[in-house]
Regions:
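Active-site loop/lid in soluble adenylation, ligation, and acyl-transfer enzymes
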Residues: 1-54, 60-61, 84, 130-137, ...
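Short, structured patches in soluble enzyme cores that scaffold and shape functional sites
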Residues: 45, 79-83, 103, 158, ...
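Aromatic/basic-lined ligand-recognition segments
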Residues: 134-147, 151-158
């Protein structure tokens, strides 16, 4: 599968992850980058379909967490690796570390003042915020996700494991505000206070690469390097 940035429907995006995961189970690491059209609400694997409001296509991804609203302003990245790879240690949390650090370093090259989330920082979320994160990805924090220096969330990470392989998924709002998801969730306004703690690359980058294409140009080689044995 090509690692060139591709425009895909929501359903095709879901299929990309499944295809990469199956290939990884056979020993082949892979990488794909996507922008979604038409706009689609992507639910987490265990999220209730009743969370979705009308007005956009709805699909369900294989990784957990809350919903992400995806359109041509959100960069989606899938990486899949076989068991035994550096991105597939037994410790699920630590599997995120090299990926989060690579994304953080690349975004810093765009002039973004950002850092990765510490394990204890993520665990310190109160119950109300944890509940919000089960509905909207951007409402919560997970270890090694990328946030700005002031703590606003910039990059979401998720992971799916099957026998012999691990799929990592990355979501980066480049020109679409993360809070756009609120319009596509039932009673989404109730989550607004947590979505204020988010940002998009276009509003914080210090150079002209703050488009999905430009952002992928910066991330493509570092992420390919992660896949190499």
């Amino acid at each position: 599968m090509s690692d060139a940035l591709q425009r895909r429907t929501g359903s095709d995006y879901i299929e990309v992850g499944a295809t990469l995961l199956a290939a990884a189970a056979e020993g082949q690491a892979g990488l794909a980058a996507t922008i979604v059209s038409p706009p689609t609400l992507v639910l987490g694997s265990a999220q209730s379909a009743t969370d979705a409001a009308t007005g956009a296509d709805v699909v369900r991804r294989g990784t957990g967490g809350g919903a992400v609203f995806c359109d041509e302003g959100v960069l989606l990245i899938d990486l899949a690796v076989p068991a035994g790879h550096a991105l597939a240690p037994e410790d699920v949390t630590e599997a995120y570390r090299p990926l989060g650090e690579a994304v953080q370093h690349a975004l810093a090259g765009l002039g973004v003042d950002c850092r990765t989330v510490g394990v204890e920082e993520a665990r310190a979320m109160d119950d109300a915020r944890k509940a919000a994160a089960r509905r909207a990805c951007w409402a919560g924090l997970s270890p090694y996700e990328v946030v700005l220096g002031d703590g606003r969330k910039l990059v979401g990470l998720a992971q799916r494991r099957r026998r012999g392989a691990v799929l990592h998924q990355v979501a980066i709002p480049v020109t679409t505000p993360p809070a756009e998801v609120l319009s596509h969730l039932v009673e989404g306004a109730l989550l607004a206070q947590w979505l204020q703690e988010t940002a998009m690359v276009a509003s914080v980058a210090g150079c002209g690469s703050a488009t999905p294409v430009g952002t992928w140009d910066v991330l493509r080689e570092p992420l390919n390097a992660l896949l190499r044995p």
